């Protein structure tokens, strides 16, 4: 799947068209009010572009939370409509459902240039294709009803725009089932695709991937795929201990050890050698006597090892220096996973040093792309989003792209 040849909203003629946009308005709500409108803000450029370019109506659809195929009022998108009205400075027509004759009629009757927000897609089991029942058992949707649901959604628009990168790895009805002739990315999805194409299809070299995370076995596909693309790999986080113990018999105390992952280590090291990829591992650690913000802590080296009863919770000063050097040598940097338990201040320094190095690299002309999830949280904690080239909005979606998988929501977009 090429990421760089998909239709974008700017390739579409929108005049007089009903523009059906899949957005990601999955926002935190407290007492009926949106507590963080970041995702709503992020969709505004696409919505405004459609309005400014002659769309007859803009119809927005989204999920919120996990209502498991039932209409549950606390998961209603109604509070989002109020927030969106404030941000757009124009009325938003909120509909009580997302499909059905009443909804089709309401969309047709909405005034010219209207913004219409449909109710939560996941109030219907047909959006995800399955749900959990009261006993927590998975139940599947009736395939004929899924087809009907998709056809009903399709009837609401003339052109389809997907601006929900965070769910692009899910083959949900609103992502893959809307068979309008022209299906394009919105600005958010386009930015994601442009940056990931830059890294995965045509990187400026040297190309460095920084990987963290707890288990080798969780990241094995990611590591394998990266070894075919990068010049250098930095491995931090809990999974570094599985490598160190397996390869060099370093004492790791009570640090994370991933037995199934350890069986993959030799193959990874062999492949790196064959592909001429340098792997940079930590050589010292900040260890704690318990997994706790208030743990006693000290620095140990590979030679000393992690004492019994202690665990490695961050990388140490020598490792910070090695990681920084690797970052400053690279021209394209992909960062997925912090090197330590950044939530605890005593074990957050490795993440901050790495962040500072990536910011410095950008200032020197490198491209830095941050995969979503924990790494994006590190960046946000230090208000550094604007200082890096791109911080992905999709944790799961960006991980699957980096693993070399096809994203269903992207594959469904029309080619140029």
UniProtKB/Swiss-Prot annotation:
GO cellular component labels: cytosol; mitochondrion
Q: Could you tell me which pathway this protein works in?
A: Carbohydrate degradation; glycolysis; pyruvate from D-glyceraldehyde 3-phosphate: step 2/5
Q: Which terms are listed as keywords in the entry?
A: ATP-binding, Cytoplasm, Glycolysis, Kinase, Magnesium, Metal-binding, Mitochondrion, Nucleotide-binding, Transferase
Q: Which cofactor does it need?
A: Mg(2+)
For the ligand (AMP), the binding residues are: 214-215, 219, 238, 312, 343
Annotated (2R)-3-phosphoglycerate binding lies at: 23-26, 39, 62-63, 65-66, 121-122, 169-170
**Is the Iron keyword given for this protein?**
no
Q: Where in the cell is it found?
A: Cytoplasm; Mitochondrion
Task: Extract the InterPro entries matched here.
Answer: Phosphoglycerate_kinase, Phosphoglycerate_kinase_CS, Phosphoglycerate_kinase_N, Phosphoglycerate_kinase_sf
Q: Major place of localization? A: cytoplasm
- Amino acids binding CDP: 213, 218, 237, 337, 342
Which BP terms does GO give this entry?
gluconeogenesis; glycolytic process
Q: Which SUPFAM superfamilies match?
A: Phosphoglycerate kinase
Q: Which residues bind ADP?
A: 213, 237, 342
UniProt catalytic activity: (2R)-3-phosphoglycerate + ATP = (2R)-3-phospho-glyceroyl phosphate + ADP
Q: What GO molecular function annotation could you give as one example from this UniProt entry?
A: phosphoglycerate kinase activity
Q: Which residues bind Mg(2+)?
A: 214, 218, 374
Q: Which residues form a coiled coil?
A: none
- The catalytic activity of this protein is classed by the Enzyme Commission as 2.7.2.3
The entry describes its oligomerization and partners as: Monomer.
| HAMAP family xref list | Phosphoglyc_kinase (MF_00145)
Q: Which family does it belong to?
A: Belongs to the phosphoglycerate kinase family.
Question: What protein am I looking at?
Answer: Phosphoglycerate kinase
């Amino acid at each position: 799947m090429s990421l760089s040849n998909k239709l974008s909203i700017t390739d579409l003629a929108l005049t007089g068209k009903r523009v059906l946009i899949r957005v990601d308005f999955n926002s935190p709500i407290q007492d009926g009010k949106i507590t963080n409108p970041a995702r709503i803000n992020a969709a505004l450029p696409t919505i405004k572009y459609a309005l400014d370019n002659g769309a007859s109506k803009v119809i927005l659809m989204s999920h919120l939370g996990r209502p498991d195929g039932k209409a549950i009022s606390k998961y209603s998108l109604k509070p989002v409509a109020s927030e969106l009205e404030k941000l757009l400075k124009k009325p938003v027509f909120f509909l009580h459902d997302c499909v059905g004759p009443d909804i089709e009629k309401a969309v047709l009757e909405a005034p010219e240039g209207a913004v219409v927000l449909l109710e939560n897609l996941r109030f219907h089991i047909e959006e995800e294709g399955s749900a959990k029942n009261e006993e927590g058992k998975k139940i599947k949707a009736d395939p004929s009803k899924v087809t009907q649901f998709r056809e009903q959604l399709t009837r609401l628009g003339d052109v389809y725009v997907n601006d929900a990168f965070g769910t692009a790895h899910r083959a949900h009805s609103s992502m893959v089932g809307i068979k309008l002739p022209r299906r394009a990315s919105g600005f958010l999805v386009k930015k994601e695709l442009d940056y990931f194409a830059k890294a995965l299809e045509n990187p400026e070299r040297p190309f460095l991937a920084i990987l963290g995370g707890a288990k080798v076995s969780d990241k094995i596909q990611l590591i394998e795929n990266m070894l075919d693309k990068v010049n250098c790999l930095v491995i931090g986080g809990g999974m570094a201990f599985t490598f160190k113990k397996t390869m060099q018999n370093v004492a790791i105390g009570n640090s994370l050890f991933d037995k199934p992952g350890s069986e993959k280590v030799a193959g990874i090291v062999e492949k790196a050698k064959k592909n001429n990829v340098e792997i940079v591992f930590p050589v010292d650690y900040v260890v704690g006597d318990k997994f706790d913000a208030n743990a006693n802590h000290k620095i140990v080296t590979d030679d000393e090892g992690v004492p019994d009863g202690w665990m490695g919770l961050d990388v140490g000063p020598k490792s910070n220096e090695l990681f920084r050097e690797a970052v400053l040598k690279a021209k394209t940097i992909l960062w997925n996973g912090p090197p330590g338990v950044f939530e605890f201040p005593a074990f957050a320094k490795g993440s901050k040093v790495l962040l500072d190095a990536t910011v410095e690299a950008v200032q020197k002309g490198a491209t830095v792309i941050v995969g979503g999830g924990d790494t994006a949280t590190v960046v946000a904690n230090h208000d550094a989003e604007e200082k890096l080239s791109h911080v992905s909005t999709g944790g799961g979606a960006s991980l699957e792209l980096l693993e070399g998988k096809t994203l269903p929501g992207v594959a469904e977009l029309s080619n140029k």
